[in-house]
Amino acid sequence: METPLPKAPEKRQVTAIIFLLLLWEAGSATIKYSVLEERDSGSFVANLAKDLGLGVGELAARGARILSKGNKQYLQLERKSGNLLLKEKLDREELCGDIDPCILHFQMLLKNPVQFIQGELQLQDVNDHAPEFLENEILLKISEGSHPGTSFPLKIAQDLDVGSNTVQNYSISTNSYFHLFTRNHSDGKKYPELVLDQALDREEQPQLRLTLTALDGGSPPRIGTSQVLIVIVDINDNVPEFAQRRYEVQVPENTPIGSLVITVSARDLDAGTHGELSYSFFQYSNQIIQAFEINSITGEIRLKKALDFEEIQSYHMEVEASDGGGLSGKCTVAIEVMDINDNAPELTMSLLISDILENSPETVVAVFGISDPDSGNNGKMMCSIQDHLPFLLKPTLENFYTLLTEGALDRESRAEYNITITVTDLGTPRLKTEYNITVLVSDVNDNAPAFTQTSYTLFVRENNSPALHIGSVSATDRDSGTNAQVTYSLLPPQNPHLPLASLVSINTDNGHLFALRSLDYEALQEFEFRVGATDRGSPALSSEALVRVLVLDANDNSPFVLYPLQNGSAPCTELVPRAAEPGYLVTKVVAVDGDSGQNAWLSYQLLKATEPGLFGVWAHNGEVRTARLLSERDAAKHRLVVLVKDNGEPPRSATATLHVLLVDGFSQPYLPLPEAAPAQAQADSLTVYLVVALASVSSLFLFSVLLFVAVRLCRRSRAASVGRYSVPEGPFPGHLVDVSGTRTLSQNYQYEVYLAESSESQFKFLKPVLPNFLGEGTGGDSETNSNSRNHFGFN
């Protein structure tokens, strides 16, 4: 609300200082553009509709307007296309002078609803000005007694451009007496100085003419020149000295023309013409010589032109005192212009609506801007309207206000309002400006319901029970009776694929919202819809709000192992060389979790291993690595069970079974492990059955062979002579005949076990290798025939 002004209890005020940069129905962001100066009128700057994300024709529908400070408009808006154009050619030097960067502020006003958008246009400098010396010829008197190394300041060149386009360097024409030194000043300017290289002789050369060149940094660069006339004078012992090196003075901007500003004073200890002093401006600009003049004899500086604080706040110049012998001294004069309250505030009306519907609170009546070119308290302003009126002044952007209805208007009580807007500054004396407007009230019957919030956010945990109450929306109507009775409804969703009717319902009387079914976070994380509130007036009015439902994740999904596959097919066996170093990467368990957040954070650990301590699992990435060096004593086959666990509450887990085979080299074959299913008990039982069957068949076969040999031996023993044994001539191997009389055989039998991929065992029985003897009692070597084996398979 407004703050009362002293001595004005009948007015309400809003202090602009407190509410600077406060935005109403608009964001605080500023759109910024830049354009080169001197571009033609109508040049394209930007497309506001595109940059602001507005639809085609929305700027025209909302009556978009460009507002600038004061009455000067530099920009224009094409509402249909949204293009922002230059209204006229802009000269950076005229608008900003030596201020860099040069920024022009503007605002865009939108209606329905009212919205302000702050904008900045930066004028970029082009090198359209060349350096310029204020004097075509610079006179410099130098005593012939000056020592080498003495420096003599020269007058600088002026360049209206800024930055790199202003003066960057000076040069002097070639000569044998001087060279040029450029000094960088704290104000950013560069000052040329002549430095004496060798002693001067007036009798040999009484004067010298040089050319001073100033070069800017533009592309292409521009130059300016001035002639330097050096007059060599007789030896002068003393240099003029000012009483102060720097003079400072404050001058009110309303000081009359011709008034004395300040007097500078210097003295010279020489006598005669060498002691006579003459004062003049040394380093100065056009603005200085237009505003001030100096008495060459007395050193008085007087006002030549009326000062204006709003244009120039301070002046800096160098004053030179020269004696008759050519020597000179210099001092600096700083003149600060003091602001006085000589400008009344200005009010610029941007939007005015004369007809306002009754019972329409916060309806915009007018939009206007205020300004005061003064500074300090003289430029601070307060804005107010009369008291006891149902209207409110609301600051929007800096020095922009909106006049709107504060409460319900009743046309039957009062059909017309005369409002006086008063803008007062805080200077001494205070100046003010008044603006009168007339507002007519149009008759209506009711007010639309208004939601307590423009948007609602509801949280529902997944796997909820159907018909769960998830939240409420609420709207109120400023009317009474049936006009204030509000009913709620779900509006058609903007997303045609959202089955809103099967997700939520609303109680039409109280706005309670219910979930119609159990929600699944993995299928639907969030959804939004609009609800409407309609009163029962005639005609009925309604409003709407946005409801956003966020489904909270529950830990209802266990981790799923992607690798190694756990689908009951052939097991995946990892080969590890026995020469592997500790930390050797065996494999990596890859798993995912359908949940989110910490419910999907997975950790890995080794749950079971054939030989604990041989392998390890990294907790965060599932990498299976060797924990130590492998040895020949380590079993060749290993079975690892890796546990994958999420971070939910309660946690869920899954296991992955790995088979590892230790090999001496990757080139040798390996036997797959018999287990395909993770059930260890079933695999152990199958192994027992296979061993028992193998032992039984082997025993039966061995018994049959022994019986056959015994029968043959018995038959031969009958025909053999006493103490003598005979070996048949056929291919029967002699090593199967018991010649020692102990009736035992020395032949060994062996078998292999072949494990097929179908997890069913196959046995391969091998017949002993029978060597061919060269002859009885020869004692020759035997040769193994590997092709004489018989295979027997059992499934």
From Swiss-Prot:
InterPro entries given in the database record? Cadherin-like_dom, Cadherin-like_sf, Cadherin_C, Cadherin_CS, Cadherin_N, Protocadherin/Cadherin-CA
The reply on keyword Repeat is: yes
* Membrane topology reported for the UniProt record: Single-pass type I membrane protein
The record's annotation in CDD domains points to: Cadherin_repeat (cd11304)
Q: Which biological process, per GO, is one annotated for this protein? A: homophilic cell adhesion via plasma membrane adhesion molecules
Pfam families given in the database record:
Cadherin (PF00028), Cadherin_2 (PF08266), Cadherin_C_2 (PF16492)
Q: What is its main location?
A: membrane
**Which segments show compositional bias classed as Polar residues?**
781-795
Residue ranges that the UniProt entry lists as topological domain Extracellular:
30-690
In the UniProt record, the signal sequence range is 1-29
List the Cytoplasmic topological domains.
712-795
Give yes or no: UniProt keyword Oxidoreductase. Answer: no
Q: Which GO terms describe its molecular function?
A: calcium ion binding
List the GO cellular component terms. Answer: plasma membrane
Q: Which UniProt keywords apply?
A: Calcium, Cell adhesion, Cell membrane, Glycoprotein, Membrane, Repeat, Signal, Transmembrane, Transmembrane helix
SMART domains recorded = CA
Q: Which residues form the Cadherin domain?
A: 30-133, 134-242, 243-347, 348-451, 452-561, 568-671
Q: Subcellular localization, per the record?
A: Cell membrane
Segments carrying the region annotation (Disordered) are 776-795
Q: Which residues cross the membrane?
A: 691-711
Q: Return the Gene3D superfamilies for the record.
A: Cadherins
Sites where a glycan is attached: N169, N184, N418, N436, N567
Function (record text): Potential calcium-dependent cell-adhesion protein. May be involved in the establishment and maintenance of specific neuronal connections in the brain.
Query: What's the protein here called?
Result: Protocadherin beta-17
Species whose genome carries this gene:
Pan troglodytes
Q: What taxonomic classification does the UniProt entry list for its organism?
A: Eukaryota, Metazoa, Chordata, Craniata, Vertebrata
- Gene field: PCDHB17
